[in-house]
C-alpha cells in the first residue's frame, strides 16, 4: 500500500484505555503526568474515563465501556485520524470477553501508525519524548489512492 504523511498536532488527542486489573496503574500514571496531559485532548473508554475525571478533574471524552463497544469506538476514531496516541494498559494474564475488540483496536493503531503504549515504561517514554508537545509527521496508508486503485 502506498503511504502518505499525516501530521500529529502539538496538542495531541490521546486515548486512554485500561483493563480492569490495570485501571489503578493507569490512574497512577495519569496522576503522575497530569500537568502534561491537561494540555492535550483526552479520550477514554467509559469506566476508565469516568474514573480519571473523578480522580483528577481532567476533562475526558468518555466512550462506552470497552465490553459495550468502547474499544471499537476508539478504533473508529483512530481510523478517522482523530486519535494521535493510544495508551492502553491491557492485562496479558487474563482473557476478557471482548478480546477480539482488543485485538482489533491494537491492529488499527498499528495500521494507522500511531504511537501506542501497552505498559507504564512505554507510556513514560512516549510522554517524556522531546517531540511529545510538538507537531510530528507520521506515515499512514494513503486511503484515497488505495480506494482509487480498488475502484478501477
UniProtKB/Swiss-Prot annotation:
Any one GO CC term of the record: cytosol
Reaction(s) the record says it catalyses: dihydroxyacetone phosphate = methylglyoxal + phosphate
Gene Ontology BP, a term: methylglyoxal biosynthetic process
EC number in record: 4.2.3.3
Claim: Nucleotidyltransferase is one of the keywords in the record: no
InterPro entries: Methylgl_synth, Methylglyoxal_synth_AS, MGS-like_dom, MGS-like_dom_sf
Annotated residues for binding of substrate: 19, 23, 45-48, 65-66, 98
GO molecular function terms noted in the UniProt entry: methylglyoxal synthase activity
Alphabetized UniProt keyword annotations: Lyase
UniProt xrefs under Gene3D superfamilies: Methylglyoxal synthase-like domain (3.40.50.1380)
The keyword Lyase appears for this protein: yes
Active-site residues per Swiss-Prot or TrEMBL entry: 71 (proton donor/acceptor)
PANTHER family, A to Z: METHYLGLYOXAL SYNTHASE
Biological role: Catalyzes the formation of methylglyoxal from dihydroxyacetone phosphate.
Name the record gives this protein: Methylglyoxal synthase
Lineage, opening ranks: Bacteria, Pseudomonadati, Pseudomonadota, Gammaproteobacteria, Enterobacterales
Amino acid at each position: 500500500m502506498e503511504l502518505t504523511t499525516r501530521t500529529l498536532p502539538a496538542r495531541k488527542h490521546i486515548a486512554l484505555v485500561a483493563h480492569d486489573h490495570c485501571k489503578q496503574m493507569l490512574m497512577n500514571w495519569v496522576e503522575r503526568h497530569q500537568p502534561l496531559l491537561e494540555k492535550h485532548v483526552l479520550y477514554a473508554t467509559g469506566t476508565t474515563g469516568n474514573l480519571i475525571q473523578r480522580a483528577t478533574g481532567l476533562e475526558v471524552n468518555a466512550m462506552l465501556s470497552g465490553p459495550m463497544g468502547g474499544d471499537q469506538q476508539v478504533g473508529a476514531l483512530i481510523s478517522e485520524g482523530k486519535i494521535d496516541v493510544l495508551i492502553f494498559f491491557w492485562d496479558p494474564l487474563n482473557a476478557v470477553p471482548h478480546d477480539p475488540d482488543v485485538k482489533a483496536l491494537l491492529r488499527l493503531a498499528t495500521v494507522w501508525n500511531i504511537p501506542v503504549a501497552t505498559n507504564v515504561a512505554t507510556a513514560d517514554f512516549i510522554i517524556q519524548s522531546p517531540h511529545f508537545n510538538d507537531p510530528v509527521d507520521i506515515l499512514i496508508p494513503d486511503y484515497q489512492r488505495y480506494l482509487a486503485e480498488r475502484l478501477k
